[in-house]
Amino acid sequence: MNGRDLALALVSPGDAPRGHRDLACASLKALEEHLIDAVSEHSADGLIGAAVCGAGPEIDGAIALTAGDFTLTQAWLRAVLKTPRVSLLNDFAACALGAPRLAPSAMRLIHEGKPGRNAQIAVIGPNLGLGVAALTPHRTDGWTPVVSEGGHIDFTPGEPREVPVFEALQARHGRVSAEHFLSQQGLADIYAALGGGLDDSDEVILARVRDGDETAREALSIFSALLGAFAGDAALSFAARGGVYINSPLMERIDGLLDQAAFSRRFEDKGRMSAYLKDIPVYLAVGRCTLLGLSALFTASDLRYEAAEVKVLDC
């Protein structure tokens, strides 16, 4: 749930989610109606619990949705769903849990490297905002998610061509965070700062990249470089020797258009830590990581995410 849209799916413990549907959902009332309908539709299946994630930090069993004007709480969800077994977590914690469960065919290597054994993983996703999380190996065979609000850290230019873009965003926002660059709006703002259209969407900009538009191509190259720099920072912050996964609808639209040379150059450009980053692989993960991550919670009898067991699933 991101405050605008809702993704729903049914899952049996240990299996991939099924019956996935996307629904418009911009209010608590609409969410309640969708959940009641879903419970009614699947009443014969025997609901044993629910795993719910929202776009925003989870604090004491509540998430104030960053793209909405209402708050999700565990207590409210339990009452609506009529089950005490409800897990509520940040959407990128769920995305992180899902990333290593994707089938190998859903992974595209965008920075060469060799993942370390029993090493932590970082997961990032520029979309409406900039999601950041990590996974640390569990004491058994699973993963424990590490939640982060790292998308809101300060961000500064690292190359001369990025300075005018930074100054344009600083003039608009004052303090500039990573999310101001690495998001749907961020790509549009980079393009506008280079002289492109002021209100063009990422879809329009990417179409122009495909058509060979030089301004659009430069905007995407800068975006790619900044993404590489941020991915490198995430790898350092989480000691992510197991790799960095990038997953979001925006990145799926970019995919083969990414400037991998610019990405890798900035990913490794970390001074004396460059050698540390050189061997860390980075993957573009294509798929519904969030739903896969939520389904992982149903492998544990108590639905704690510490007990999530990783299993590769085609989805």
Swiss-Prot record:
Give the Gene3D superfamilies listed for this entry: 3.30.420.40, 3.40.367.20
UniProt-recorded name of the protein: Glucokinase-like protein CC_3167
| Cellular component GO terms, alphabetical | cytosol
Q: Please report which protein family the annotation says this sequence is part of.
A: Belongs to the bacterial glucokinase family.
Indicate the secretion signal residues: none
Could you name the domain of life of the organism this protein comes from? Bacteria
Asked whether the keyword Kinase is assigned, the reply is yes
Family matches, as PANTHER family: GLUCOKINASE
Keywords, A to Z, come to: Kinase, Transferase
Keyword Ubl conjugation set for record: no
Task: Look up the record and give one Gene Ontology term from the biological process aspect.
Answer: glycolytic process
An example molecular function term from Gene Ontology annotations: ATP binding
Q: Which InterPro entries match?
A: ATPase_NBD, Bacterial_glucokinase, Glucokinase
